Regions:
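Membrane-water interface segments that mark the loop-to-transmembrane alpha-helix transition
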Residues: 67-91
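Interfacial/gating helices of multi-pass transporter permease domains
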Residues: 1-5, 22-43, 109-112, 168-173
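Membrane-interface junctions at transmembrane-helix termini in multi-pass inner-membrane proteins
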Residues: 120-150
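Residue-level recognition of pore/gate-forming positions within transmembrane alpha-helices
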Residues: 13, 40, 122, 148-153, ...
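Membrane-interface helix-loop junctions in multi-pass transport and translocation proteins
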Residues: 98-101, 142, 152-184
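C-terminal transmembrane helix end/exit motif
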Residues: 49, 53-57, 126, 130-134, ...
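Interfacial segments at transmembrane-helix termini and the short loops linking adjacent helices
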Residues: 29, 75, 94-123, 169
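Helix-loop junctions and terminal segments of transmembrane helices
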Residues: 38, 42-66, 134-137
Length: 197
């Protein structure tokens, strides 16, 4: 568990630091501020979701041994979480301008263009967490560390590529693509559990 926690603690800040540095040097410090602001909003609600997963979902997965029961728990989680996310993220998107005005100065209003891609990326991120938490619950350290490192690197590479085409919003687009692929990867890793009858 310690190694897994350390891996996440190392890969996430490093990837964000590399991308932030690129935005500052190649685009502008102002737009780097927009992206940082978007990250902070995202971090606030992701912390709440992570905490709730850690309190119930992770211990529940840890205690289950039978593949059928694990699948049932995962499906139940998706049935609860996905509709809630769709409603919550729709509200956040619709109220994005109000949120920016409350939390930041008017100079951050152009940040509203980042919301769609960030929210879509967070949706797939949370959906992938419902599976990746199984890596932690079953102490699949090698798979966890490998995927964390691989997808952090993938995010940085995609971020550089998308930014060259679309500017700072390219990071958020890369974030979405990265977590769609990550979710597919988690489905592949746990295919035997997910498709058990």
């Amino acid at each position: 568990y310690t190694l897994m926690a350390l891996t996440t603690a190392a890969t996430v800040p490093v990837s964000q630091m590399l991308l932030r540095g690129y935005v500052i040097s190649e685009i502008s410090p102002v737009e780097a501020g927009w992206w940082e602001g978007m990250n902070r909003i995202s971090h606030m609600y992701l912390m709440v979701i992570t905490s709730s997963f850690s309190v119930y979902y992770l211990p529940r997965l840890s205690e289950l041994k039978d593949s059928v029961e694990i699948k049932r728990e995962i499906v139940k989680a998706y049935k609860v979480i996905v509709p809630m996310l769709l409603v919550a993220f729709t509200l956040v998107y619709l109220l994005r301008t109000v949120m920016i005005r409350i939390l930041f100065t008017p100079e951050f209003l152009p940040m509203e263009n980042l919301f769609f891609w960030q929210l879509a990326g967070d949706f797939f991120k949370i959906c992938s967490w419902l599976l990746s938490f199984l890596l932690v619950a079953k102490s699949m350290t090698k798979a966890f560390v490998s995927t964390e490192v691989l997808f952090s690197l993938n995010f940085v590479i995609l971020g550089f590529l998308f930014m060259r085409m679309n500017g700072v919003v390219g990071i958020n687009q890369a974030y979405l693509v990265n977590y769609v692929v990550y979710l597919i990867c988690m489905v592949f890793i746990f295919r035997r559990i997910l498709y058990v009858k």
